[in-house]
Amino acid sequence: MGGAGAGMQLDINEIQKFLPHRYPFLLIDKVVEMERYKRIVAIKSVTINEGFFQGHFPGKPVMPGVLILESMAQAGGLLLLQEIPDRDRKLLYLASMDDVKFRRPVVPGDQLRVEVDILAWKGDRCKIRAKAFVEGNLAAEAMLLCLMVDRERANNSGK
């Protein structure tokens, strides 16, 4: 895969080069569209094999809303990390969420289509608009603020 512009796509192996998340917390399976400095469209295939369905909820499995938000944040992080030249020395954190709305449940068998647009980027902060769709229907939406920090500084801050 790979490429440039709006047609840029990434498979799971390429995604893992950018995101530090791994199973069971990597919530993006592929990128189907990416326009540098602007937007990304990513896919999460939701299956009954996801560990969270064991307890959320027995007999009526529903993807937890916080994990839908996490998939949005991961897609946003993937887009932002494309633009950082020294990304191996940086970490992205989710700093805040605003206007979060859940519109419909996401269940096993659904394909979550996550669309993220960069609204503003100033210094180490970036504001993004994220939406998640299932079969063309809005499932969730949020405004997210991401914060970029030096990896070494973040690793030393807990001492």
Predicted segments with their positions:
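Hydrophobic beta-strand-centered segment that forms part of the acyl-chain substrate-binding groove
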Residues: G2-Q9, G76-R113, A139, C146-L147
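Hydrophobic core residues within well-ordered beta-strands of beta-rich domains
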Residues: F25-L27, L112, C126
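N-terminal leader/capping segments at the start of a protein or of a new domain
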Residues: M1-E33, K159
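Beta-strand-rich interaction surfaces with strong enrichment in secreted/lumenal proteins
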Residues: Q16, G59, F102-R104
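Helix-adjacent hinge/juxtasegments
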Residues: H56-R87
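Catalytic strand-loop segment that frames the active site of acyl-thioester-processing enzymes
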Residues: Y23-M63, I68
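A structural signal for short, well-ordered beta-strand segments
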Residues: V31, A42-K44, M97-D98, F102, ...
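HotDog/MaoC-like acyl-thioester-processing domains
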Residues: G7, P20, R36-Y37, V107-D110, ...
